A protein has these predicted regions:
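Active-site beta->alpha loop and helix N-cap motifs at the rims of alpha/beta catalytic domains
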Residues: 14-17, 35-126
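Surface-exposed amphipathic alpha-helical tracts and adjacent flexible/coil segments at the periphery
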Residues: 1-23, 28-31, 35, 60-70, ...
Length: 407
């Protein structure tokens, strides 16, 4: 069964992450300028950097969406027109907006940019989605709280020209589509103006009211004790349902995460989307790839009802570590590498890259920049060479299981 292929939208917290997402198969990337983005600590693009980022993406056939999704105060609104004009002039394809005033100003000062409505607007029904379309929105990012049946209903009862976007992978906020005041209250950092401190991820202790100052740590057992820590969403096994529900764009969360995360998760979803759209069984090797990045235990979120939200632990699973990044490779497989973490001759490592299925090898003797034998590269970012069984593309990764890193 052939299906319409949705856009794959990947995070790009900086230029390295953007290039990785592009190389590994993103149809579009989303990023932020230095103002009015919801993840001010996730990496941003300056006014000088943004045109270069847009040009790079467009040269590779990839669209650029920019977040303008904070809830600005009156004292901040005067800076919006100039910011929007810069985005418009840079060639940005779409703006992700949450505030109605910012949405209106975007129509005036960034007329070349599509207007997409952020998940911060908590769009949970067809009437709200249609209302935004009637106001001029090209796309709405649906609330994470929706079930698959609710998405189908929204698709059925809205204009077919309105595009529906939903998150398919990554962290989930325990608040209603990000409308949380914990950060404001506990740290003074406004979660709805791009400065969330993520207090829902903290580990808490208990204090009994008649024993002030005595703190009892919250221990974890087989039933779980962490509070407010949701699992990460992973819908890679259910992309057929999302496509059949009428979703036009699948979004990967993670602008604050690593370039390796952006690459591996994008690559995994790229291959599975292509398989499902062509009616082929999904190759399990790509499903396994999402287990090779740092993540919390996975769930299907609310797509199939509340049970997908049950959780036992807030701890990250970090089973794999990057050793090096391939910066170049000859047709014979002689790879030039940039070191990220120590490894040595004789270790078993994996190689994975753009359109490259992961394969294992035993590390041979390496060579430093002066052509001298190298048993264990140790200096971060150092350049060295290593022979591989076959040629691989630039931006491929050498990685190993974490238990090897103690050698």
């Amino acid at each position: 069964m052939m299906r319409k292929k949705p856009e794959l939208l990947s995070p790009a917290g900086d230029m390295e992450k953007l290039k990785m997402a592009v190389a590994y198969g993103a149809d579009a990337v989303y990023l932020a300028g230095t103002s009015f983005g919801m993840r001010s600590f996730a990496g941003t693009f300056s006014p000088e950097e943004l045109p270069c980022a847009v040009a790079y993406a467009h040269d590779h056939g990839v669209r650029v969406h920019v977040t303008v999704n904070t809830m600005p105060r009156s004292g901040e609104v005067d800076a919006l027109p100039a910011h929007l004009e810069r985005l418009n002039d840079a060639g940005v394809d779409a703006l992700i907006l949450a505030d109605l005033g910012a949405f209106t100003l975007a129509g005036k000062y960034a007329p070349r940019c599509e207007r997409h409505i952020s998940t911060q607007q908590s769009i949970a029904n067809y009437a709200c989605a249609q209302a935004w379309y009637d106001l001029g929105a090209k796309r709405v990012v649906l609330a994470r709280e929706l079930s698959m049946d609710e998405i189908r209903e929204i698709r059925r009862r809205t204009s077919p020209e309105l595009e529906l976007e939903t998150f398919c992978h990554g962290a989930m906020c325990v608040s209603y589509s990000g409308r949380c005041l914990l950060s404001n209250y506990m740290t003074g950092r406004d979660s709805n103006r791009g400065a969330c401190a993520q207090p829902c991820r903290y580990q808490y202790a208990l204090m009994e009211e008649k024993r002030p100052g005595e703190y009892f740590p919250v221990f974890e057992d087989e039933k779980g004790t962490y509070i407010m820590n949701s699992r990460d969403m992973c819908m890679i096994d259910h992309l057929d349902d999302l496509m059949d529900a009428g979703v036009d764009c699948l979004k990967i969360e993670g602008r604050a995460k690593s370039a390796y995360y952006a690459a591996i998760v994008t690559g995994a979803y790229r291959h599975v989307i292509d398989d499902v759209a062509q009616g082929r069984p999904a190759d399990p090797v790509w499903r396994d790839e999402v287990e090779h990045v740092s993540h919390r235990h996975y769930s299907t979120g609310f797509f199939y009802g509340p049970p997908g939200q049950y959780y036992e632990s807030s701890r990250y699973i970090r089973d794999w570590q990057i050793c090096a990044v391939v910066t170049g490779c000859t047709p014979e497989g002689l790879a030039t590498l940039s070191l990220r973490n120590k490894f040595r001759t004789g270790d078993t490592v994996e190689v994975v890259g753009p359109d490259t299925r992961p394969f294992s090898l035993t590390v041979p003797e390496m060579t430093d920049a002066d052509g001298l034998p190298l048993f264990e590269p140790k200096t971060p970012q150092m350049t060295f060479t290593m022979s591989l069984p076959r040629s691989v593309p630039p931006m491929s990764f050498i990685r190993h299981a974490v238990d090897l890193s103690g050698k």
